Amino acid sequence: MNRARDELGAHMSIAGGLSLSLERGREVGCGAVQIFLKNQRQWAAKPLAADEVRQFRAARRAHAIRHVFAHSSYLINLGNPNPALWSQAVDAFTDELERAEALGLSCVVIHPGSHMGAGLEAGLARVTAALDESVARTAGYRVKVALENTAGAGNTIGRTFSELVALLERAARPERLGVCLDTCHLFAAGYDLRTPAGYRRAMAECDATVGRGRVLAFHLNDAKAPLGSGLDRHENIGRGLLGLTPFRLLLNDRRFTRVPKVLETPKEPEPSADLRNLAVLRRLRLRRRLGR
């Protein structure tokens, strides 16, 4: 398979300019690239310049990277019970959707957030209201929102498929929403993907709740922390507690062949870490894909 045309890739740095992320992706053979849209440690950022947009779109064509999407800033908590901080989060997320639309990205991945002790139901209500507001402000946009499953630590929302589907079902415009599944987070939340039976159970639950057609992206990460630990600790593919089996099963599951899958594994040493992890993943493919 032509590496520039498959659905595998990695999160890439935007240091020096958005378009450089795509050049970095090409250098390690990405067919998919995830980026931050701005410095993810800061709330404010200067508006996108028309030249930046043109350069980014030209670089994407030149490097033949099929799938490009974004991850939102980690500062954003759509479940914040504080009204002022909630409004700040909504404004920031709306800005990210606007940037993603200008760049022609497919979706923006976001952690649903934390209820910060207010309780799960209150948190779900706050996140739903935030998503509805951001989507309403970007009416007519093509870019989608991908809710990422969480590892389950503390007061985070989105640990289970049932929590994710609660957000999807309550949304005013559910057609703009989907999910991004992180393998490390699934394992940390208690989904044991290490056997074919465990993988089938998890994907069956996903299909029965969220629906496989709403899976917009995958984060492929091995795990440093034990099953059900709630700890978000990423490891290189095959070198953590998940092992290779979950990745082999996913990469040969034809239900998800066209869904982009990116690494969020340790980057050191660069770029050899990404090169190694992508090579491991590509070797796991079978000529005959598995499917149910």
What are these regions (language model features)?
Residues 1-72, 76-98, 287-292:
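N-terminal pre-domain/capping segments
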Residues 2-3, 23-30, 48-69, 96-104, ...:
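Acidic (Asp/Glu)-rich catalytic clusters
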Residues 11-15, 38-40, 72-75, 113-115, ...:
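Active-site beta-loop-alpha junctions enriched in small/polar residues
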Residues 25, 71, 89, 100, ...:
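Conserved, mostly hydrophobic/aromatic
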Residues 31-36, 66-70, 177-183, 212-224:
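Non-cysteine beta-strand/loop elements that form the S-adenosyl-L-methionine
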Residues 78-178:
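Active-site acidic/histidine proton-transfer and metal-coordination neighborhood
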Residues 157-165, 187-258, 272-275:
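Gly/Pro-rich active-site loop or hairpin
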Residues 271-290:
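C-terminal helical cap(s) of enzyme catalytic domains, especially alpha/beta-barrels
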